[in-house]
A protein has these predicted regions:
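Alpha-helical scaffold segments of alpha-solenoid architecture
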Residues: 232-250, 256, 283
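Conserved positions within tetratricopeptide repeat
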Residues: 98, 134, 138-141, 158, ...
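Bacterial N-terminal signal peptides that target proteins for export
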Residues: 2-15
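TPR/TPR-like (Sel1-like) alpha-helical repeat modules
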Residues: 294-302, 315-345
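Compositionally biased alpha-helical segments
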Residues: 28-171, 175, 179, 186, ...
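Bacterial N-terminal signal peptides
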Residues: 14-24
């Protein structure tokens, strides 16, 4: 895999951080539609936007929408291909989204905010594809940094920061991943701030720092807020804590935690399911239950492979574990898939 150093160097990071801080409001008046995370929408004119969100004017009243609490904005004048691309991207169909984005003729677009949307979804889709092994991480990171530099007033600002952290972590650049994830603590939405802590916990897991990871996850588990977003982050944090406990050799405690998680598992939430079964695999390994660990990682591999980082981790563990039960040929198969889908993992 291409080295991340040219993209995630200290100099580039400082430039990017400076861009982060300089994001400023921008005013326009058009008929637009802002959708929240529940799918409800309000129509009006986006009269101001910044990295922290947008202000929508309707019948003389101004309503604030925070970045992190917006699912999408449909702008007056959106090309049909952008509308389709946005829908595909938010549904995880990144190839189809890029196909539609390539049909957009930028020279026919009058509003800068719409050009900004095109640029963001290009960068987002390329990043997500790179994370799934279908593109170069270095190129995807470069496009995201270019997006942030050219669109300092975008409500997608923190989304871009999270993706940059994901790309850095996928490249084993944990230090830069921590910096990007920590920057999300400056976001206006409570859930984004909490997600920042969860993501930092994932980095600690990558570094095999069990106590530090437990500390991050426990901060989330101790929260009283019960919004849908935060409850979901608490479930993810339980799975992360189970892995951290396993790293510390507390297999029984980790196993008990994953028992509860599996009993309450919703298989439609692929990310949660994949992380729970990987946590189960880690807890079984800590108990020297190799067959149990293999079964858990196979759940992720066979049922939840669309979650790329969890799938890659499951394959990596299967490469190590299959020979221990006398099946080196299965290890070779897992290694081949790991190298072809996630080169450099």
């Amino acid at each position: 895999m291409t080295s991340m150093k040219p993209i995630f160097s200290p100099t580039r990071l400082l430039v990017f951080a400076f861009t982060w801080m300089l994001a400023a409001p921008f005013a326009q008046a058009q008929l637009d539609r802002v959708y929240d995370l529940q799918g409800d929408n309000v129509s009006g004119a986006v009269v101001e936007r910044s990295k922290d969100g947008v202000k929508l004017e309707k019948a003389g009243a101004i309503k604030d929408f925070k970045a992190g609490e917006i699912s999408k904005i449909m702008f007056e004048g959106d090309p049909a291909s952008l509308t389709k691309a946005r829908g595909f991207a938010l549904d995880g169909q990144y190839d189809q989204a890029l196909t539609e984005l390539k049909k957009v003729k930028l020279n026919t677009i009058k509003r800068d905010v719409i050009k900004e949307e095109v640029a963001f979804y290009y960068a987002m889709c390329e990043a997500e594809l790179a994370l799934s092994g279908q593109g170069k991480i270095d190129d995807a990171a470069r496009r995201l940094i270019e997006f942030a530099g050219a669109n300092r007033d975008s409500w997608h600002f923190y989304e871009a920061g999270k993706l940059l952290g994901d790309l850095a972590l996928a490249s084993n650049n944990s230090e830069q991943a921590l910096k990007y994830y920590k920057s999300l603590e400056n976001a206006p939405a409570e859930a984004t701030k909490i997600e920042a802590r969860y993501l930092q916990g994932l980095v600690q897991l990558k570094l095999k720092q069990g106590p530090a990871a437990v500390a991050d996850f426990d901060k989330i588990l101790g929260l009283k807020s019960q919004t849908t977003q935060i409850v979901r982050l608490q479930t993810l944090s339980k799975a992360g804590k189970a892995v951290a406990l396993a790293i510390q050799g507390n297999g029984e405690q980790a196993n008990a935690l994953t028992d509860t998680l599996i009993a309450e598992l919703n298989p439609e939430d692929v990310e949660i399911a994949a992380r729970i079964y990987n946590a189960r695999g880690a807890s079984c390994e800590a108990l020297d239950d190799i067959e149990g660990a293999i079964m858990a990682y196979l759940h992720t591999h066979l049922m939840f492979s669309v979650q790329p980082d969890a799938h890659a981790e499951a394959l990596k563990r299967l490469v190590e574990l299959w020979p221990r039960v006398g099946k080196p040929e299965r290890a070779a198969q897992a290694r081949q898939e790991l190298q072809s889908r996630y080169p450099g993992f």
